[in-house]
Amino acid sequence: MVQFASRMEQLKGSEIRELLKLTAQPDILSFAGGMPAPELFPVEQMMEASIAVLKEHGREALQYSTTEGFPRLREQIAERMLAKNNIHTDKDHILVTSGSQQGLDFSARVFLNPGDVVLLESPSYLGAVNAFKACEPKFIEVPTDDGGMIMDELEKILATTERVKMIYVIPDFQNPTGRTWDLDRRHKFMEIINRYEIPVIEDNPYGELRFEGEYMPALKSLDTKGLVIYLGTFSKILAPGYRLGWVCAEDEILAKYNFMEQAASLQASTIGQMETSKWIDMFDLDAHVNTIRECYRKRRAVMLETLAKELPEPCTFTRPDGGLFAWVVLPEYMDAKDLQMKCLAKKVAFVPGGSFFPNGGHDNTLRLNYSCMPEEKIVKGITLLCQTIRENLR
């Protein structure tokens, strides 16, 4: 009989990925995914960049490359991190990964032994939880409110908990809630982190997708001790199919991530990196991000307007200033998984929120995505969802 490693008991398929299989039919009004709008992918421009790379550097593009990543792309990433996040870095402090999801996997392997403690926001990104589970840690959820992680609660946990090896956060337009940390909390967080000297994984896939309000500084830009490991990605600002993300960290930490890259995949795709780099040199990434931002701004507005009109009391929802998601809290007696089945019968899909709490509970919550559906379908789908909620109120 085949015997598997004990860590496999910790792993299960992503509930979101499983749900996406059910919602693949074209007649489903799906708020379930976290995918960019495919109609915004710069297909023609990418074809030009691809042809240019193959004509000018074809053999290099099809060959193995360095573990760290294509040098020109790492320079471009460093330049953008300075321009957009006020993070002063250079290409030697950047490792290109196969999506930021690989950066999450490496983070677990670099820092965690079985039984170590990971602190994260409550709720938090399901993909990160699943990546960390392979290393068999204990999860402690830090309470949050509309301003992000509650710092007094973080202090209490750190003062009374042993073996805290890592803190994972999404300060900008968090997945799944859409919330953004305010400036005071960012400064307070870094003050606490500097005192306890615990590594922080700052996951920032949505930071450039701000629709309104002031840009907040990245935690990495406030880092004076080299404790913040910053994860970025091209998936939300260009195209996820290239599977290109990056890690920005100080020398000692980044060296460990390099070892993980060598062991896992040797490197990220050479041709994908070179085509992305060429596209950035040939075209205007800022203009492209503005196009994405404007599209999502309109879709978010339509979703929030429809929720405000149709969602019955005592239900509540978040009003994100950017990103891809809104978060709904139902009455405590209502189970979002039961609601999900009733909505699927009406051809409407969403993600039940309990999946985003690693220690369980909170089954009266759900996540809604607005990036991938035209405005008129958002109105129809949200109206049907709210109608179904109303039918199940006590």
Located regions from the model:
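Conserved core of the PLP fold type I
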Residues: 60-197, 201, 207-225, 296, ...
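Conserved glycine-rich beta-strand-loop-beta hairpin in the small C-terminal domain of fold type I
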Residues: 277, 294-304, 316-329
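Conserved core segment of the aminotransferase class I/II
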Residues: 224-294
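N-terminal small-domain helix-loop-helix segment of the aminotransferase-like
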Residues: 7-99, 106, 281-282, 349, ...
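A non-catalytic, amphipathic alpha-helix used as a structural packing/dimerization or gating element
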Residues: 72, 256-259, 290-302, 380, ...
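Conserved PLP-binding catalytic core of the aspartate aminotransferase-like
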Residues: 314-346
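PLP-dependent enzyme catalytic core of the Aspartate aminotransferase-like
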Residues: 345, 359-394
